[in-house]
């Protein structure tokens, strides 16, 4: 399996491009973005890497070459600083959440896959921290927006003009003071997971066939008796959906949860140290490695994931730019 890893370093303004080989990162390229580069997302057809940049608010569309290196980008304006981005399932639309500007924007793409200027902005989404595209088993589609300061996950549908409208079934409310931050979706069982930044809990929800979303459970991410500041960051499932990992920035811990294959219930299993202040991480497509950055570290860590238990062991560390935050992994030899 051939894989490429992209790491965004906002303080340095760099995207580091690596080849992942047996738990090691082999440098391929350093790309200067000309700004504070933060959220990264790969297009559904894997031909583009989209990078949000500030303070000149824009998105850069980088063409991805056959070996994973990035070509010269096109540039399009954004309505504000992007804290998180995603595309729809077809690669026609680009969504950007702005935590600082309390909005979500919708940008079309041209026929080649380049992001264009936004055609819609929805304001008054307090601390809109992330955008997550959800496609149901019956063809329904919606956008989930985690609004940290509202303790609400906003739900939107797309109309025939490719614009967002409030979902007729309403929004999802978290516990007061939880601070919903990032979401991830189970690929088959209808469950979705929300990492809450402020109280460091992990919520599991279930989406019914009729579109209703209901809460199933909420678990603490941190070790029993933890007394430090709570500052949750990121979460990801392994490709086989047997394990889920979260990161917390004060303790610099990665937490491992088991996912029951029958009913989806979560079980906290263990905690593992990683780079200082792990703002972002990713799991490779084989499910063998977890790649973690640290905002207060100048290195990125590659952890090996034990196949049977999910336990982490450090495989390697590699130097990167300052303030590393975002990690994305591309599989070059993905089957058609």
Q: For each predicted feature, which ranges?
A:
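Beta-rich, blade/repeat-based domains predominating
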Residues: 34-45, 78-94, 121-140, 174-190, ...
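An edge-strand/N-cap motif at the start of beta-rich repeat modules
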Residues: 1-21
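Structural signal for beta-propeller blades
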Residues: 14-15, 57-59, 102-104, 151-153, ...
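Loop-centered beta-sheet repeat module
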Residues: 144-201
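Short loop/turn segments immediately following the C-termini of beta-strands
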Residues: 10, 54, 99, 109, ...
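Short loop/turn segments immediately following beta-strands, especially the blade-tip
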Residues: 18-24, 62-68, 107-114, 156-164, ...
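A short beta-strand motif characteristic of beta-propeller blades
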Residues: 26-32, 71-76, 117-122, 167-174, ...
